[in-house]
């Protein structure tokens, strides 16, 4: 049986017609120049007047039906109105037009059969063309005709023109591609939108002390701590060491909050009266709107807050009791940090929260989402036929874009162009493709199903040449429990335009993150917790937009869960380390071959070079840097000409064991049977045992260095101290060049002068003691 050919996971360069012309890598300057032009027939139905009544009451319930071939679009209808206003736009794709005439019919809504009021017919050959930046076409009044072409009472105001996707009416228009979608919510879910991430702040709560607490049991020393609640986040201080009614903590707690501030900060002072029982001694609520905002580490004024206590009275009523207890705190919003909501490796924005600290932008990123090909069926329609309703989401900085959804197509064409301001070239733009599962009543029939992932592409801006248009077809890869799968390809056009080359070069000398991350850094555990909270806030806020950018989409774009354990990813990282060290290992092997005179000519040349450098040591550093310069110039001919893309071999996705993939997709905590968990635990113990051995060996070598002067082995330390004294005397009376010359000739000596036994220094080092004898 013949094996199927391997899937093509490579990146392909393309030559599309962008902006009406072929791209050759030169700079283009026209609007929508990174996408292919798509022709549409636009019909703007503005209003009607003096419509005749069709009912017994002499009134009408009018609506307009726009018909082009087999496509029909209808406006909303009005009840009992003879002068209705619609102001709706219909867009028909010119590629699918199979008619010669456009018909706009005004009808009267009825229970049995809608009555014809009148119509207007247009010959497609007579319709004008309009392309921005031309002004919008002015609508005109058209007299209605009956089915025989006779003029009837009533007029309809219309504007009809041929245009492209660059038209201002395009985003909000009804599209013939989505003629099968009905319902206001479903139509809103298929339109292109731009979203903005909420402005995130770090909230620092410095709990200093409390005074005059009133515990219920005055015969014991209270164990007091403070619980701080901010939305869904809750942190607590340690139990105060001063077990009294005036406890002290001086402890910092960090939270993530988003503008607009909707919830107050809740502080609760509690006494641990039993192992699983805490008693509330007082509470206070602090509105965030009135807190200080600081942009550096200048001290914030501390404040005393009164504590209140709610007591449940007879009848279940809550009574608020005010007493003299107070809590002393410093609370501020930190504007000098960048709130991390993305994976640190794929950050698209590194600016601080405070806009006052932002530097000017250094360029513009332009992205053209052209089309996708070969998409896989993501769901089944009625009758069992597979279908895909694909849309794209791109994120860079605080701006998210969502393209329109192309209904029932495995080769969707979007041809939408977007721009972002760039403040740092060492950032990443992420483009994801998803299947829209909220159409055709998807929210009801599918139980609110999630939008399925089709794939994702990341492009690092620093890998792009300035002012060059990159047009490539990227593979869309998704890792399943059964292995990596190609879901199709997405065709993108990308251009990074630099406004100031000098400013961009200067950025490479600046720290990646704002100053506060280095002057007063947060701990790793704090950053992990704050990143998790930030992603939750962003996904919640974007889910509340209209139409929503759903939680599963946001989390996939932000790489939530990428820090979880994965055997496949661990192997990939190990081989990445080996790839980095391979150059050093290759140099070591090359030097070893020189030392054993494997190639006598090369060894002689190295001897000559060594002697020159010993005689003229001032040439060492210039020689090294000149060598690196020549290597860089030599490699320029073979520099990468394409952006990097997902590499299945580097990720070990093409060779991962099914059980390893099943473990990677396991929930946390695990949901697998106990025997499988036991097997994986034993495997992890085996791997950890080998790592433990390697770490122990490294610790042993370090401890041997420490024992040289520790007198743990008195004879070894005595020998080393005596050797140091002799070496100091010899090096003092001998010129350095002579010493270096002697050491070099000894290292490069001929194999006939070598012994296969280990050297004396190595034998001495291996005999030194380590602390392994003290290990249990």
Curated annotation (Swiss-Prot):
Belongs to the MCTP family. Residues 22-142, 181-305, 346-474 form the C2 domain. Its main location: endoplasmic reticulum. The keyword Cytoplasm applies. Disruption phenotype: No visible phenotypes. Plants lacking both FTIP3 and FTIP4 have a dwarf and bushy phenotype due to an accelerated stem cell differentiation causing early termination of shoot apices associated with an increased STM localization to the plasma membrane, but compromises nuclear localization. The keyword Transferase applies. SMART domains: C2. Residues 1-16 have a biased composition (Basic and acidic residues). GO terms for molecular function: glycosyltransferase activity; metal ion binding. PANTHER family: FT-INTERACTING PROTEIN 3-RELATED (PTHR31425:SF50), PHOSPHORIBOSYLANTHRANILATE TRANSFERASE ISOFORM 1 (PTHR31425). Highly expressed in both vegetative and inflorescence shoot apical meristems (SAMs). Accumulates in root meristems. Observed in flowers. It is found in: Endoplasmic reticulum membrane; Cytoplasm; Vesicle; Cell membrane. Interacts with and regulates subcellular localization and trafficking of STM. Keywords: Calcium, Cell membrane, Cytoplasm, Endoplasmic reticulum, Endosome, Glycosyltransferase, Golgi apparatus, Membrane, Metal-binding, Repeat, Transferase, Transmembrane, Transmembrane helix. Its cofactor is Ca(2+). It is a multi-pass membrane protein. This is FT-interacting protein 4. Residues 1-23 are annotated as: Disordered. The chain crosses the membrane at residues 577-597, 608-628, 719-739. One of its GO terms (cellular component) is cytosol. It comes from Arabidopsis thaliana.
């Amino acid at each position: 049986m013949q094996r199927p050919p391997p899937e093509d996971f490579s990146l392909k360069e393309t030559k599309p017609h962008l902006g009406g012309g072929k791209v050759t890598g030169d700079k283009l300057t026209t609007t929508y120049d990174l996408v292919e032009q798509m022709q549409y027939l636009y019909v703007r139905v503005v209003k009607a007047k003096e419509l005749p009544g069709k009912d017994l009451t002499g009134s009408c319930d009018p609506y307009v039906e726009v018909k082009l071939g087999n496509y029909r679009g209808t406006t909303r209808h009005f009840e009992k109105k003879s002068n209705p206003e619609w102001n709706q736009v219909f867009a028909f794709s010119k590629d699918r037009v199979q008619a010669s005439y456009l018909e706009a019919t005004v009808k009267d809504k009825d229970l049995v059969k809608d009555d014809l009021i009148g119509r207007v017919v247009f010959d497609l050959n007579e319709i004008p063309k309009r392309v921005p930046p031309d002004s919008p076409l002015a609508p005109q009044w058209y007299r209605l005709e009956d089915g025989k072409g006779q003029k009837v009472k009533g007029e309809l105001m219309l504007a009809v023109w041929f245009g492209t996707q660059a038209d201002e009416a395009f985003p909000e228009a009804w599209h013939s591609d989505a003629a099968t979608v009905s319902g206001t919510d479903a139509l809103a879910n298929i339109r292109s939108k731009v979203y903005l991430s909420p402005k995130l702040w770090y909230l620092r709560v410095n709990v200093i002390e409390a005074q005059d607490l009133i515990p219920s049991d005055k015969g014991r020393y209270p164990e007091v701590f403070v619980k701080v609640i901010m939305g869904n986040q809750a942190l607590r201080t340690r139990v105060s060491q001063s077990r009294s009614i005036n406890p002290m903590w001086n402890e910092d707690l960090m939270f993530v909050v988003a503008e607009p501030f909707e919830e107050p900060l809740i502080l609760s002072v509690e006494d641990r009266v039993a192992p699983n029982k805490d008693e509330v001694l007082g509470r206070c609520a602090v509105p965030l709107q009135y807190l200080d905002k600081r942009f550096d580490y200048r001290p914030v004024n501390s404040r005393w807050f009164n504590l209140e206590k709610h007591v449940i009275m007879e009848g279940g009523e809550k009574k608020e009791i005010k007493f003299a207890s107070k809590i002393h705190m410093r609370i501020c919003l930190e504007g000098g940090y960048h709130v991390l909501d993305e994976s640190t490796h794929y950050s698209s924005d590194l600016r601080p929260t405070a806009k006052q600290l932002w530097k000017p932008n250094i360029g513009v990123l332009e992205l053209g989402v052209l089309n996708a090909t070969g998409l896989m069926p993501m769901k089944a329609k009625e009758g069992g036929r597979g279908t895909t309703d694909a849309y794209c989401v791109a994120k860079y900085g605080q701006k998210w874009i969502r393209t329109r959804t192309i209904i029932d197509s495995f080769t969707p064409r979007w041809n939408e162009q977007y721009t972002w301001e760039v403040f740092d070239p060492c950032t990443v733009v992420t483009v994801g493709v998803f299947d829209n599962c909220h159409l055709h009543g998807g929210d009801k029939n599918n139980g609110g199903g999630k939008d399925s992932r089709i794939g994702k592409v990341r492009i690092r801006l620093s890998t792009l040449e300035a002012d060059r248009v990159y047009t490539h077809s990227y593979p869309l890869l998704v890792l399943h429990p059964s292995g990596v799968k190609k879901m199709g390809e997405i065709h993108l056009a990308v251009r990074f335009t630099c406004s100031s080359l000098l400013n961009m070069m200067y950025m490479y000398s600046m720290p990646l993150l704002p100053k506060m991350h280095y002057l007063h850094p947060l701990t790793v555990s704090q950053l992990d917790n704050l990143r998790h909270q930030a992603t939750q806030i962003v996904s919640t806020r974007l889910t509340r937009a209209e139409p929503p950018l759903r939680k599963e989409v946001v989390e996939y774009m932000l790489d939530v869960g990428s820090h979880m354990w994965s055997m496949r990813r661990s192997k990939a990282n190990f081989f990445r380390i080996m790839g980095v060290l391979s150059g050093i290992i290759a140099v070591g092997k090359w030097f070893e071959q020189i030392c054993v005179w494997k190639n006598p000519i090369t060894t002689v040349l190295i001897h000559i070079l060594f002697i020159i450098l010993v005689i003229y040591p001032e040439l060492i550093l210039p020689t090294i840097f000149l060598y690196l310069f020549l290597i860089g110039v030599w490699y320029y001919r073979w520099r990468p000409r394409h952006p990097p893309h997902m590499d299945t071999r580097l990720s070990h996705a093409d060779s991962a064991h099914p059980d390893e993939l099943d473990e990677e997709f396991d929930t946390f905590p695990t949901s697998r049977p106990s025997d499988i968990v036991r097997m994986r635990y034993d495997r992890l113990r085996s791997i950890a045992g080998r790592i433990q051995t390697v770490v122990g060996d490294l610790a042993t070598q370090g401890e041997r260095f420490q024992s040289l002067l520790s007198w743990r082995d008195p004879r070894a330390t005595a020998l080393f101290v005596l050797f140091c004294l002799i070496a100091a005397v010899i090096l003092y009376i001998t010129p350095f060049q002579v010493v270096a010359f002697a050491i070099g000739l000894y290292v490069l000596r001929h194999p006939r002068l070598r012994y296969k036994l280990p050297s004396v220094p190595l034998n001495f080092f291996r005999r030194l003691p380590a602390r392994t004898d003290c290990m249990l």
